[in-house]
UniProtKB/Swiss-Prot annotation:
Record InterPro entries: Miracidia_Ag_8I (IPR026240)
Protein name: Immunogenic miracidial antigen 8C
Feature: compositional bias, Polar residues: 1-15, 45-59
Entry similarity comment: Belongs to the immunogenic miracidial antigen family.
Organism: Schistosoma japonicum
Positions of region (Disordered): 1-95
Higher taxonomy: Eukaryota, Metazoa, Spiralia, Lophotrochozoa, Platyhelminthes
Sequence ranges of Acidic residues compositional bias: 20-41
Length: 95
């Protein structure tokens, strides 16, 4: 019957959202939710996808909500807004 482990809290999204070692660095490495969104949508995903990925991914940043993932402008393919936010915003998970 059910073989899904409850240790995989994001399995229901159908997106590839790891919570492995690459995910809790500084949030600025190239393996983060933006790549997972790109797996689903060759553009940059809808804001809802980004919010979903950011929220779930940042559960283990220590209490950050979806903003932790959503405002991460210093990515080369970014959050779907073409990097219009200045780099000074830095890594979103510091919110």
């Amino acid at each position: 019957e059910f073989t899904i482990s409850f240790s995989s809290p994001v399995i229901s999204t159908g997106q590839h959202i790891d919570v492995g070692d690459e995910d809790y660095h500084d949030g600025d490495d190239d393996v983060d939710y933006t790549d997972d969104v790109d797996d689903v949508d060759d553009s940059h995903g809808s804001p809802s996808q980004l919010l979903q990925g950011g929220y779930q991914r940042n559960q283990h940043y220590g209490g950050g909500n979806y903003q932790s993932g959503y405002y991460r402008p210093n990515k080369q393919h970014g959050n779907g807004y073409g990097g219009q936010y200045p780099k000074k915003y830095g890594s979103g998970h510091k919110y």
